[in-house]
């Protein structure tokens, strides 16, 4: 049963009438450009064919009812006429409440809604299950009430909800790619202007995501520390963000910076340059150059930004040994566990899967999860 069928059927059973719309918003994987988003830099993600799906209908009152199919059909109810505050017990409900609350601040011309939510974006893996939920909820209200909001505004609203209501300091990339993804393309995103450029993916190349299953937590983890170190670096150069610092400027005065901050800054500056170059390499189908750029990105995350863990480095090495320069591989996401992403010629996918199955668990004691994905369309009706 598809997520659409599942949520529609649950909706009819729970609420006693049929849903009028079903909306999806995808998860994402970032091909290159890690921790650059909150430094006003560039990222190169693609939406993937794992998504959050919501079957929904407008109500004729001011009540919101939300059922979470993936959490034992837990039900949250709240009113649009009372202050929206955090739910005492359900963390998932806070993503919904946060999106609705921030949408009210943007455009308060919507009424109540019934929703049933289900998703297959792996949680806690760095594939943006939370952003896909935020964008899906925003798109539901936009579609049901014909709100004059575009994808970028729905994405910004989701980011605000996560930063201010949920309390996780995320950048804008995750929500933006979920809202604006394009089938068979990656999206080069300028995180300052929010300008996007669709970059066609080479034919015959699979986007493979391998979850290390090494558990990580982003809220309250090292993520916020890295963000502070980057802000310290930008202040040193008297710039609003590291986006505005050149590698030449950095090299001239790197010795004056705190050594740890210097390493963090160097990662951001070199990663931005790699990301812009990767977009043109991908468009030209130059997998050899893409392979080099992804390898440099991983080394920079490991040595300068220090966000990889031994399990992730092991996964990258196993994949690299199989694909050589025929494809690229690197850690993706916030770090400290999570996933690696690889661009792999389709004919090499079985060999990679076999090598990982034979070696990863033997070396780490953890069993990986392997996903072969397609670059997919952003949020909309399904």
From Swiss-Prot:
Where Mg(2+) binds, per the record, is at 130, 162
Q: MF terms per GO, please?
A: ATP binding; galactokinase activity; magnesium ion binding
Which coarse location class applies to the principal site listed for this UniProt protein?
A: cytoplasm
Question: Is Signal found in the keyword set?
Answer: no
Q: Which residues form the active site?
A: 174 (proton acceptor)
An example of a Gene Ontology cellular component annotation for this protein is: cytosol
Q: Where does this protein act, in terms of pathway? A: Carbohydrate metabolism; galactose metabolism
Pfam short name (any one)? GalKase_gal_bdg
Binding-site residues, substrate: 34-37, 223
Write the record's keywords in alphabetical order, separated by commas.
Answer: ATP-binding, Carbohydrate metabolism, Cytoplasm, Galactose metabolism, Kinase, Magnesium, Metal-binding, Nucleotide-binding, Transferase
Record carries keyword S-adenosyl-L-methionine:
no
Which InterPro entries does UniProt cross-reference here? Galactokinase, Galactokinase_bac, Galactokinase_CS, GalKase_N, GHMP_kinase_C_dom, GHMP_kinase_C_sf, GHMP_kinase_N_dom, GHMP_knse_ATP-bd_CS
Q: What is this protein called?
A: Galactokinase
User: Which gene codes for it?
Assistant: galK
